[in-house]
Amino acid sequence: MEGQTPGSRGLPEKPHPATAAATLSSMGAVFILMKSALGAGLLNFPWAFSKAGGVVPAFLVELVSLVFLISGLVILGYAAAVSGQATYQGVVRGLCGPAIGKLCEACFLLNLLMISVAFLRVIGDQLEKLCDSLLSGTPPAPQPWYADQRFTLPLLSVLVILPLSAPREIAFQKYTSILGTLAACYLALVITVQYYLWPQGLVRESHPSLSPASWTSVFSVFPTICFGFQCHEAAVSIYCSMRKRSLSHWALVSVLSLLACCLIYSLTGVYGFLTFGTEVSADVLMSYPGNDMVIIVARVLFAVSIVTVYPIVLFLGRSVMQDFWRRSCLGGWGPSALADPSGLWVRMPLTILWVTVTLAMALFMPDLSEIVSIIGGISSFFIFIFPGLCLICAMGVEPIGPRVKCCLEVWGVVSVLVGTFIFGQSTAAAVWEMF
């Protein structure tokens, strides 16, 4: 029956998820996971530390979140092996049934679309600030047409982002992910060093707040952490592209990736907050003098970092549309080239459509800080709720001892409840701030 889960059929052993080519090395998987997590959220972490009321409460929230973040990645790898599916939405649909699968697809597509828009908006802002810095020596005058992000962002999208987004497999992104990870490391290093060197023109708060105003303010940073560390959407695709897919090996890859990300995020958050205190901007680079050459280089490299992570997000969003194409009647009409959704004649139009839609939205979108809470709230579905549901549903697939089974089911329930709380709290707070 359509409503049956794999657990009702019973599987003697874990099938390997179907994938075109398992060519990704362990180090490549680490870099892609890191790059998926090291996105625009890096700029928001000093602001999140300020909102939480200081270093200690924010760091504690980060450590608690890290437990669930790593757990979610491990669960997704296990669920992919059990279900035999090669995409996040396919795993959820295979284990939890078609109804939850459709909900996952809708949330997945919406979340990735908004993340892509946010990334393009960050790139556009950095390009605009970079142009302002380079033209700062000229008298005040209207901004030249070639410095307007309405020109620079579409040009960058056509010449750089679109070619990087064209490849069929996610394994290709391991090359650009190394460059993007190094760019994120440079940003963290700059913020740390700037705190100690204290360059001329830098003004910081003399006595930053070191205690939270309320528990509500502490909980309010969860969406920023979810937005920052979200790499779970890519987890299944990365796992299925790896040459070595044992669960213990995947757990090691997940732990190493998130610990490295935690170090980079923590350095950025701590020293950005200690430098500016409660006056820190939601985009920490905006708090630094615009004519500082070190900051100008950081802007360029961070824009490069976001450019390299955008294709990963596009790949995941495109996979949802390809699944829809495969299940619908669209693939059965016309030439045989259109029957394969991963083929060039289907893949490239979907890629161009995604870039065009997100670019149009980015050029008219409000300030990034206004939607981070919403994105972070939706991300809780993919970090907490769906992995928890997959773990609960997967318990009937393999023979497991009753005590271990009970413990894993309890952990799945806890994960779902925590994700539901974060989604409700962050969404309510975002709506409240809008009005």
UniProtKB/Swiss-Prot annotation:
The keyword Membrane applies. The keyword Membrane applies. It is found in: Membrane; Cytoplasm, Cell cortex; Cell projection, Axon. It is a multi-pass membrane protein. One of its GO terms (molecular function) is L-amino acid transmembrane transporter activity. It catalyses: L-glutamine(out) = L-glutamine(in); L-alanine(in) = L-alanine(out); L-histidine(out) = L-histidine(in); L-aspartate(out) = L-aspartate(in). The chain crosses the membrane at residues 29-49, 55-75, 100-120, 151-171, 178-198, 218-240, 250-270, 295-315, 348-368, 374-394, 410-430. Its main location: membrane. Electrogenic sodium-dependent amino acid transporter with a preference for L-glutamine, L-alanine, L-histidine, L-aspartate and L-arginine. May facilitate glutamine uptake in both excitatory and inhibitory neurons. The transport mechanism and stoichiometry remain to be elucidated. It is linked to Foveal hypoplasia 2: An isolated form of foveal hypoplasia, a developmental defect of the eye defined as the lack of foveal depression with continuity of all neurosensory retinal layers in the presumed foveal area. Clinical features include absence of foveal pit on optical coherence tomography, absence of foveal hyperpigmentation, absence of foveal avascularity, absence of foveal and macular reflexes, decreased visual acuity, and nystagmus. Optic nerve misrouting and anterior segment dysgenesis are observed in some FVH2 patients. Belongs to the amino acid/polyamine transporter 2 family. This is Solute carrier family 38 member 8. The gene is SLC38A8.
